[in-house]
């Protein structure tokens, strides 16, 4: 017992020492710079998207475990997909132990934020919106975690989806709280899932 503790403690310290913060700011080639950061980020790192309006023509994706991606507020860090040409969603997450917080995803061609096959996904203080108002041509879902475990949606806002603002499907251990869904066909929908706690919305 003592030897296990002795060796594991320095290992934990070493992992924390190598964790870093990575910053991306607005400006030329924002699409390429942000996607590159999402690819190169390492477990334990935090990616900070600085305040600004970022315009994208392609969807973004994250497939690195154990990271945090955060903006500087839903009214300050704006990921704008109005001119999106490719990609089935604004942001696709396929990794475990991820926290996303404090930014907005606007006018995605398809679903705004899709999470698939994740274990441990925290979505905190995020907004998804289609700014042209409710339309059948808007993306189907604002928040769309499926086939996932340990899902937290907290303090989020979903506006204008052509189906559900917040949809959780084929998942388990789910909390949806303190969130707002407006002008969607359905507000919050939990389907084919286990152990869901939905409150204060």
Annotate each language-model stretch with its function.
Residues 7-14:
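Bacterial N-terminal signal peptides
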Residues 34-35, 57, 81-91, 107-114, ...:
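Extracellular beta-strand/beta-solenoid scaffold signature
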């Amino acid at each position: 017992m003592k030897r296990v503790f002795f060796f594991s403690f320095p290992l934990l310290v070493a992992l924390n020492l190598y964790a870093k913060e990575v910053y991306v700011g607005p400006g030329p080639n924002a699409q390429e710079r942000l996607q590159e950061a999402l690819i190169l980020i390492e477990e334990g790192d935090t990616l900070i998207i600085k305040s600004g309006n970022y315009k994208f023509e392609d969807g973004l994706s994250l497939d690195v475990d154990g990271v945090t991606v955060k903006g500087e507020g839903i009214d300050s860090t704006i990921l704008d997909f109005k001119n999106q040409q490719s990609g089935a969603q604004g942001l696709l997450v396929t990794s475990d132990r991820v926290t996303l917080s404090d930014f907005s995803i606007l006018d995605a061609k398809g679903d705004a934020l899709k999470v698939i096959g994740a274990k441990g996904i925290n979505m905190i203080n995020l907004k998804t919106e289609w700014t042209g108002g409710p339309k059948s041509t808007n993306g189907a879902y604002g928040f769309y975690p499926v086939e996932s475990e340990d899902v937290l949606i907290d303090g989020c806002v979903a506006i204008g989806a052509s189906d559900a603002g917040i949809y959780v499907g084929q998942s388990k251990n789910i909390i949806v709280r303190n969130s707002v869904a407006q002008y969607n066909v359905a507000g919050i929908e939990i389907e084919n899932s286990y152990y869901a706690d939905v409150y204060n919305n």
